[in-house]
């Protein structure tokens, strides 16, 4: 809406970035999750969602806005950092971006489907693998059975 007039309805489409930001405001409100997703914020170490997600049963972590599976519990490990850590994402579901904020050079990870900020990837994972350090507030969890059932519909 622009001054009470529906703009996008007249155009007939909306850019994906705009759609997910509006959906984010609707689903996340003005929360830490919104700050993480759209302002490249970071969860507090050992946040409530991390405490819930660190010991989930077999399943997948999905993008809180698009529902796309991003990370698998089979690739999760305890890095001791206070953030969810994985050795890899689900194939083709994330994008990497150079991040030079705060005087550091890092690789930012975003959801390919919604574009939201997920976290960063570092080269210090187990057995020479990467460590995907992911903010829990922007994820949902589904058991493998529930995810496979829903995705087969």
Language model features: what each stretch is:
Residues 28-153:
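A short Gly-Trp-Pro
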Residues 2-24:
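Non-catalytic, surface beta->alpha helical segment in thiol-disulfide oxidoreductase systems
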Residues 1-2, 112:
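Short, acidic, Ser/Thr-enriched surface-loop or helix-capping motifs
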């Amino acid at each position: 809406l622009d001054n009470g007039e529906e703009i996008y309805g007249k155009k007939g489409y909306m850019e994906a970035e705009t759609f997910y930001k509006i959906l984010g405001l609707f689903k996340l409100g003005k929360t830490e999750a919104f700050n993480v997703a759209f302002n490249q914020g970071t969860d507090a170490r050992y946040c409530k969602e991390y405490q819930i997600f660190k010991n989930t049963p077999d399943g997948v972590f999905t993008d809180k806005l698009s529902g796309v599976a991003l990370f698998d519990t089979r690739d999760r490990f305890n890095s001791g950092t206070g953030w969810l850590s994985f050795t890899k994402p689900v194939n083709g579901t994330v994008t990497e971006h150079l991040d030079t904020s705060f005087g550091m050079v890092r690789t930012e990870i975003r959801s390919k489907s919604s574009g939201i900020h997920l976290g960063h990837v570092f080269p210090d994972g187990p057995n020479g693998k990467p460590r995907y350090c992911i903010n829990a507030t922007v994820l949902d969890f589904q058991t493998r059975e529930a995810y496979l059932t829903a995705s087969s519909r």
